[in-house]
Amino acid sequence: MQQFTGFLLTRQWRDTANGLELVYWLSSGDGPLRLVFTNQQAVCFIDHETGLDSAPASRIQATRKPVDLVSLNGGKVDALYFRQQRDLLRFSDLAEEQGILLYESDIKANDRFLMERFVTAPLAVQGDARRRNGFTELINPRVKPVDYNPALSYLSLDIETDGIDGEILSIAFSGQGHEEILMQGDAELWQTDLPITWLGDEKLLLQRFLQRFAELDPDLILGWNLVNFDLDYLERRCRHHRVAYTLGRGGETARILQPQNPGQPRIASIPGRVALDGIDNLRAAFWSFESFALGHVAHELLGRKKLIESTDQKIDEIRRLYREDR
């Protein structure tokens, strides 16, 4: 058995034919780790005295067992175990319709697994390790909490587009001493000392970007309005060209979850990587500005301005610079 110390980056659950599977990605001094836990169960709790025999929810297969736990009012509870997370979700919806009280039915299996082991983010891992392409994988290892301060790798990402629904003209990323720009165009027509790689069309641009991101392999993706604009736009253009959006580690597909209701944010689900948005993080730290436009915030904090300000002519100026000053 091998031992590792890592820091939790992302967690996912997925229903399989063999039951619920939990996947955790960690950053460690030995490189990225992928922990897979198979044959797990989704769990919620119900009052011991509540019967289910005649309820429609009883048609969903679950195993009911008494446990040594009580509700907040001191009453005994039973645990309900489901082979798949979707079964618990369906059961919870039916129970609510029928006025049946459940406890902790909203806690996802991947979160409960960590909570029951008192793990927050740093953890010690012990198990049989297998080396994969760019990461180490452990199946059903032992885990426990530990003190660990990681040195996370990062890249800052920014794209420029031809309007609000046109092609991506350039993708730039930098971090930890690395700077790189991918741009549509012909190298023979443009002379520059900047670290630019020229690509013939948008599809080639996207494919090279995903290739380079996998090679640079950051733990964190940084940006301004990162999820709502850059990552969402990249996903849409990949879909347009039928290019797999493999921004996750191990070649896994990233997804930008769209809001279900007005005012909700988009959420980036990127296996093995964390997207950190500058706007969200400043707001979380209780910073307040007249405008959260990048140019305004940069001027307020750093005394610097963007080359292209957020004006009504911004798109026209981007197009002009792309034509004349690449």
List the predicted regions and their residue ranges.
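The two-metal-ion catalytic cores of nucleic-acid processing enzymes
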Residues: 1-280, 284-326
